[in-house]
């Protein structure tokens, strides 16, 4: 398995990262782990986010890293997941814990796991990498 930690937290960045990963042909299974950053960003780019994961084979979405913001517009992660699944045409799952990621690996494939976001996802990526490789 290969692991990448990327600061991508905007739809264009996410699309570019996944496109480069697909074009690299390093693997035949790309798992995108996305931590949404700020309710205001997700809501203002809701449609764009729903379409930017097309090059992934599986998308795992964590809870929103609020960065001090309140969920004033009643953002629902379940609706966000369904829209990504529909518009990006990729299986999308909400995960509450990074520890659950390996449950989604296909051990018959070489997985490229890309952690993306601007919150504390980098710390979680390091923790997961260390746990997975020990």
What are these regions (language model features)?
Residues 99-134:
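A glycine-rich beta-strand to alpha-helix segment
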Residues 9, 36-39, 64-67, 118-121:
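Short glycine-rich anion-binding loops that position phosphate/pyrophosphate groups of nucleotides
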Residues 23-27, 55, 86, 107, ...:
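Secondary-structure boundary motif
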Residues 43, 70-71, 123-127:
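Short glycine-/acidic-enriched loop or helix-start segments at secondary-structure transitions
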Residues 1-58:
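Nucleotide phosphate-binding/pyrophosphate-handling subdomain across enzymes
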Residues 15-18, 81, 122:
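Predominant activation on well-ordered alpha-helical scaffold segments within soluble catalytic domains
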Residues 2, 50-109:
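C-terminal helical cap/extension that packs against the catalytic core
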């Amino acid at each position: 398995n290969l692991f990448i930690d990327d600061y991508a937290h905007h739809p264009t960045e996410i699309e570019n990262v996944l496109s480069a990963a697909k074009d690299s042909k390093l693997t035949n299974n790309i798992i995108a782990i996305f931590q949404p950053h700020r309710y205001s960003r997700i809501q203002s780019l809701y449609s764009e986010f729903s379409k930017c994961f097309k090059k992934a084979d599986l998308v795992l979405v964590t809870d929103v890293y609020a960065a001090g913001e309140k969920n004033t517009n009643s953002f629902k992660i379940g609706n966000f997941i369904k829209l990504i699944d529909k518009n990006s045409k990729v299986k999308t799952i909400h995960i509450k814990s990074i520890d659950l990621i390996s449950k989604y690996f296909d051990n018959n494939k070489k997985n490229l796991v890309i952690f993306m976001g601007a919150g504390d996802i980098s710390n979680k990526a390091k923790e997961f990498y260390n746990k997975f490789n020990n």
